[in-house]
Each structure stands twice: as C-alpha cells, then as structure tokens.
C-alpha cells in the first residue's frame, strides 16, 4: 500500500513538472518574435549584394527569413523578395505622372507604399511565429528613406511590432581616409539618434580591405589622432574635435566586418544582431512602453476630468426647476407660419404663371365669368319674386 502511494506521489510530481515545462514551452512559443533588420547604407556600399549573401546563409542553414524590398528604382535584384514594392508601385510611371526626377520619384513611390503598409504588416504578423528574421532592403539613396516621412512611418511601425535593429553598411575601402570615416560615423550617429534604435555597423568588402583599422579608430582615440597627424587643414582639426565627441557614441555601437562576395563574417554578423536585439528589449521597448503608458494615463485623466465635470453639473442641477420660455417658442412658431405663408403664396404664384403660359388660365377666367352671370340671373329672379310678394301684401 505504501509503495503504491509513493508511486502515485512520484507520478503526480512528474506530471506536474511536465505540465510546468509544457507551459513554459508554450509561453516561449507565444513570446517568440522574429528580429527585424533594416539595412541602410550609402549608394555603392553593397547593401543589396550583402542581402543576397544573408539570404543564401539563411537558406543554407534552413533559417526561416522574410525579405521586403523597399527600393522601387532597382532594375534587377540578385534575390527573390517575399514582398516587393515594385509589384505595387510603378516607379517610372510615378515619375511621368507627377513630373518628378529620380529622387522625387523614389520618395513619392515610398509615400504611396507607406499608405498601405499596415496591410504589409498584417501579412508579416500572420507568418511571424514561423520566422526568425525579417529583413528590409532600403533604397540606395539613403536620405530618401532615413529622412522622409514614409521611411519614418515604416520604421516605427516595424519597431512597434518586432525587435528592430538597424544595419549601417559601410564601404570599407573608401573609409581608409579618416575624414571619410568620420563622415560615415556622423551619418550613422544621426540615424541612430533620430530612430533611437540599436545599430550594427557592417564594414563591407573586407575581402578587399581589412576593417581592423576602423575598429581600432573607434576603440582607441589616440590611434585616430595619429592618423590625422599629417592633415593640418581645418578639416583635420574639425575631425579631431568630432572624434572626441563621438567617442561615447562608439561605445553604444556593435560593429562587424563582412564580405558579401565570399561570405566572411556572416556568422559574427548574426551574433551582433542578437546582441543589438537585446539592447532593443532593454532600452527601446522600455521607452516605447513608457510612451504608451503616458498616453494611456493622459487619456484616462481626460476621461476622469470629463466625468467629474458631468457629475458636478448633475449635482448643481439636481432639484432645479426647468423654466420654459413660451415667448421664445411662440416667436419661433410665428416665424414658421410666416415662412409657410410665403411659401404657399410663392407656390400659388408659380401655379398661376404656369397656367397662364399653358393657356389654361384664360379658360379658367371664362369659366369664372360664366359662373358669375348665372349667379346674377338667379339673383334677379329672386328679386322679382320678392317684389311680386310685396305687391300682393300691399293689396291685401
């Protein structure tokens, strides 16, 4: 008997433990969200080629991903996106219809696409439970996306729904010059400051030029100053000052060297993406929840204020007599009657005019004259009868 009880107790504990594990697994499945990656970079930095390499890496490792192309002006893509802006907006037709140049055509195409981006978001959300990554390929003209209203709308919509990371692609061979390097870093800083999202700086084309010099400049202020020793111009002095200002900014960045050609650094790239996603949950999501709470509290406070005002009005009017202004009501009724009279007269006038135009009015008058004559004849007969009666009375 005791053995049976012990076995039952053990079985119960095991079952409870399994239920807890199953619940935890279910919670993890419900909480799982794909990481949204927005790829940015100057024209010629290799964004699209890098995205092709990322797509190949995901396919090779059987990692589910979802790619959205937001460049309406690209003629040919080296990969097949899941959603393509070109299927919705005809870039050349937009330029022709609105008489726009290349950049204006891209901005207008993005604006048109962003008006329906909530539908895109619905499609992505339906598949999100089976995805690990969502990747957005942006136009080559970086300012068209980062500084436009449509780019901001798309970024904020995605960031409010999924953990979002910005990837700023840098052309490494062109960054060996300290001034060019500083220009890239300033642009990355401005994007990060505007969006408040975590960022990964991807130094592309490391198969041509190694990126270690750039990481050293970011981590060691003195090494960057040494690189500027032979530049006595005002630009060199400005770059020195800016490097001191950006030193703290570098500490918030994740950086990695990659090659879109041979695939070097792709594994490390995804590691950095994971670290940046943690920063999203730690900072951006907390700020987002704070903003939502502030908005909700403000709306609740406004509702409470209106409710209190309504209660005060009800209390003040409680037991009060309602006075009816009969004079005002009578005046209103008289105005309505006067209006109706004028309306009737106007209708009669219109009817008379219509009858006169159609010839009916004349015949109507003739009928009236004949009616008057018959009445006069009857009157004369009555008069003669009365006179005859009076004569008879006098004779009597």
Swiss-Prot record:
Residues 284-387 form a coiled coil. Keywords: Coiled coil, Cytoplasm, GTP-binding, Hydrolase, Nucleotide-binding, Nucleus. InterPro entries: AAA+_ATPase (IPR003593), Gpn (IPR004130), Gpn1/Npa3/XAB1 (IPR030230), P-loop_NTPase (IPR027417). GO terms for molecular function: ATP hydrolysis activity; GTP binding; GTPase activity. Residues 1-30, 325-396 are annotated as: Disordered. GTP binds at residues 44-49, 204-207. The keyword Hydrolase applies. Residues 325-342 have a biased composition (Basic and acidic residues). It is an enzyme of class 3 (hydrolase). It comes from the Eukaryota. Signal peptide: none annotated. Its EC number is 3.6.5.-. Belongs to the GPN-loop GTPase family. This is GPN-loop GTPase 1. The lineage of its organism: Eukaryota, Amoebozoa, Evosea, Eumycetozoa, Dictyostelia.
């Amino acid at each position: 008997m005791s053995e049976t009880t012990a076995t039952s107790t053990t079985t119960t504990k095991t079952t409870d433990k399994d239920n807890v594990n199953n619940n935890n697994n279910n919670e993890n499945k419900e909480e799982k969200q794909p990481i949204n990656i927005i790829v940015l970079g100057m024209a010629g930095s290799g964004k699209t080629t890098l995205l092709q390499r990322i797509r190949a890496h995901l396919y090779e490792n059987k990692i589910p991903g979802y790619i959205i192309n937001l460049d309406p002006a690209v003629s040919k893509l080296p990969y097949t996106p899941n959603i393509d802006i070109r299927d919705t907006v005809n870039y050349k037709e937009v330029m022709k219809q609105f008489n726009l140049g290349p950049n204006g055509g891209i901005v207008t195409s993005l604006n048109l696409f962003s008006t329906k981006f909530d539908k895109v978001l619905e499609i992505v959300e339906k598949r999100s439970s089976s995805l690990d990554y969502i990747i957005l390929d942006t136009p080559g003209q970086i300012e068209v996306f980062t500084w436009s209203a449509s780019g901001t709308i798309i970024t904020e919509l995605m960031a409010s729904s999924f953990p979002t990371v910005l990837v700023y692609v840098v052309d490494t061979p062109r960054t060996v010059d300290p001034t060019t390097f500083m220009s890239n870093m300033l642009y990355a800083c401005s994007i990060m400051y505007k969006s408040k999202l975590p960022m990964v700086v991807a130094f592309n084309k490391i198969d041509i030029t190694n990126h270690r010099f750039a990481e050293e400049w970011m981590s060691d202020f003195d090494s960057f100053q040494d690189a500027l020793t032979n530049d006595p111009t005002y630009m060199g002095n400005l770059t020195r000052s800016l490097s001191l200002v950006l030193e703290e900014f570098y500490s918030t960045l994740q950086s990695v060297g990659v090659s879109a050609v041979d695939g070097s650094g792709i594994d490390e790239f995804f590691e950095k993406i994971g670290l940046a996603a943690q920063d999203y949950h730690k900072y951006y999501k907390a700020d987002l929840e704070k903003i939502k709470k502030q908005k909700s509290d403000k709306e609740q406070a406004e509702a409470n204020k209106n409710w209190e005002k309504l209660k005060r009005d009800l209390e003040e009017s409680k037991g009060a007599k309602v006075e009816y202004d009969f004079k005002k009501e009578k005046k209103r009724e008289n105005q309505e009657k006067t209006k109706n009279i004028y309306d009737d007269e106007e209708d009669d006038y219109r009817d008379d005019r219509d009858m006169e135009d159609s010839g009916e009015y004349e015949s109507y008058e003739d009928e009236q004259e004949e009616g008057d004559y018959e009445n006069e004849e009857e009157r004369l007969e009555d008069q003669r009868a009365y006179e005859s009666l009076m004569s008879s009375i006098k004779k009597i």
